[in-house]
């Protein structure tokens, strides 16, 4: 009897490739992600086509592009998910998650799974602990007064109060945490391992683990255990775990931004630790030779200027630059040559076809993504010529081997610039200096990409037509061209 094939997808929300050793970070500690890359396949050019959280998961679960048709919406009756396709087959399906957006009322993203387990309390679900009084934590200890004044002057007092109220609700739970194992990612992966220990080995299984970490709040163990941050041990200021979403330099000093990034880095390392716990359990249970393991993320994280982004802190603008749209994905598959680094363009809608192909279900005819098994096995060199990304009704982008093109839709609140092209192979020093002055202020040297914008725009719109895209691309002809900052 053949050993049943199984699949595990582990989602780390808001995981930036810039904070992973195998993606080129030389100072962070991510030994288990690095181990997974050595044992599996690392995808260098994976882009989330529909941003952010919910559209990405819809694409991953259904294998269909979301950007041309819709944004933050519920699953429809016409959507066919991986769990739907497993139904009626001898495949046990389970969802273990702490991402509140996966269970929004009436959205239906948990449908089809045989077993569902949810951990309360993360950002957007913090109200679950509203009734618990704060005893020994004070929310003001985590917000710098000067930064709050700057943010309030720019965004309004009500916006600041809402963020602090959310943070206070989060602290209502965090005040009881005492060890790294109290963090959401630890509890979620421990529950997933519990499922693996109990599942019937004579049947196939599909397990989706959805960790909202390392999404903000960036509250790693050092912040609630009274310890120095291991990546910034000399810091004497406040641990601003819920950064104010704005143009970074308008609110924070560079020293503050550095510490915020180091809190995030510590949380990434904690996620890595629990990835290792999962990998060890898979090996201990003898599942390595029969189980596809995919570590995925929905998007990266804008965190300032230069190498960290285009001037933003968090997703406060719908700008699909590399630091947001590019996501780290590593897959380990039995029978596939380990240690590969694949440069071919891959997208969030490729998850469902890959999982279904591996499980033997076959790629559903409604799926627009591609199974990546032929790519991983070396049977093909690529599955597409370019990638797309963006926010439905706000912005979209196309990424080719040489150029990226970003297009903003008309929206007075979000569109300081409307168009930009980025050359993939050049990062001029003066461009980085311009970004340091202001997130979207760019020098005239960038104009060299102007002739590339129109054909890239045309290619994108033609592609949207093949995906039954809706009419949403009405723009003011305001142009700005820049060299791409990778």
Model-derived features with residue positions:
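A short beta-strand-to-alpha-helix junction
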Residues: 3, 26-29, 73-79, 258-270, ...
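Conserved small/polar residues in nucleotide/adenosyl-binding loops
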Residues: 481-486
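Active-site regions of oxyanion-processing enzymes, predominantly non-cytosolic
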Residues: 2-9, 110-117, 148-173, 177-235, ...
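Active-site-proximal N-terminal segment of extracellular/periplasmic enzymes that hydrolyze or transfer
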Residues: 1-44, 48-50
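Polar, surface-exposed loop/tail segments
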Residues: 30, 60, 106, 174, ...
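Histidine-centered active-site microenvironments of extracellular/periplasmic hydrolases
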Residues: 28, 217-233, 281-340, 346-347
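Catalytic-site neighborhoods of secreted/periplasmic enzymes
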Residues: 57-178
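Core domains of carbohydrate- and sulfate-ester-processing enzymes
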Residues: 111-165, 215-252, 312-313, 318-320, ...
């Amino acid at each position: 009897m053949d050993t049943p094939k199984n699949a595990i997808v582990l989602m780390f929300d808001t995981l930036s490739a810039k904070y992973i050793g195998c993606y080129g970070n030389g100072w962070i500690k991510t030994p288990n992600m690095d181990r997974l890359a050595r044992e599996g396949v690392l995808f260098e050019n994976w882009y989330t086509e529909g941003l952010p959280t919910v559209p990405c998961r819809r694409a991953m679960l259904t294998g269909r592009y979301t950007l041309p048709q819709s944004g933050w919406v519920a699953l429809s009756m016409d959507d066919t998910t991986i769990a739907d396709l497993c139904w009626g087959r001898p495949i046990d399906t389970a969802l273990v998650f702490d991402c509140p957006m996966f269970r929004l009322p009436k959205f239906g993203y948990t449908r089809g799974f045989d077993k569902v387990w949810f951990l309360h309390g993360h950002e957007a679900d913090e109200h679950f602990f509203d009734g618990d009084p704060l005893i020994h934590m004070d929310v003001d200890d985590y917000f710098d007064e000067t930064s709050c004044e700057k943010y309030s002057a720019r965004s309004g007092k009500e916006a600041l109060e809402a963020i602090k109220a959310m943070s206070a609700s989060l602290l209502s739970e965090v005040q009881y945490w005492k060890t790294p194992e109290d963090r959401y990612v630890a509890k979620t992966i421990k529950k997933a391992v519990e499922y693996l220990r109990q599942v019937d080995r004579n049947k196939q299984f599909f397990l989706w683990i959805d960790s909202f970490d390392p999404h903000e709040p960036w509250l790693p163990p050092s912040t609630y255990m009274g310890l120095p941050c291991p990546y910034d041990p000399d810091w004497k200021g406040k641990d601003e775990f819920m950064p104010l979403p704005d143009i970074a330099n308008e609110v924070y000093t560079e020293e503050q931004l550095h510490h915020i990034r180091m809190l995030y880095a510590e949380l990434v390392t904690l996620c890595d630790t629990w990835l290792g716990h999962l990998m060890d359990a898979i090996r201990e249970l003898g599942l390595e030779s029969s189980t596809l393991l995919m570590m995925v993320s929905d998007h990266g994280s804008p965190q300032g200027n230069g190498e960290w982004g285009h001037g933003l802190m968090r997703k406060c603008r719908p700008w699909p630059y590399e630091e947001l749209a590019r996501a780290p994905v590593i897959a380990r598959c039995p029978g596939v040559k380990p240690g590969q680094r694949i440069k071919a363009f891959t997208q969030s809608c490729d998850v469902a076809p890959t999982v279904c192909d591996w499980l033997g279900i076959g790629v559903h005819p409604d799926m627009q993504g591609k199974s990546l098994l032929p790519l991983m096995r070396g049977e093909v060199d690529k599955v597409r010529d370019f990638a797309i990304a963006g926010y439905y009704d706000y912005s979209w982008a196309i990424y080719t081997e040489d150029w990226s093109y970003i297009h903003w839709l008309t929206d007075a609140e979000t569109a300081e610039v409307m168009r930009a092209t980025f050359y993939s192979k050049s990062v001029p020093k003066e461009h980085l200096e311009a970004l340091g002055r202001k997130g979207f202020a760019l020098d005239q040297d960038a104009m060299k990409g102007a002739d590339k914008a129109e054909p890239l725009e045309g290619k994108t719109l033609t592609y949207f037509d093949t995906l039954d895209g809706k009419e949403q691309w009405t723009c003011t002809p305001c142009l700005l061209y820049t060299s791409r900052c990778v």
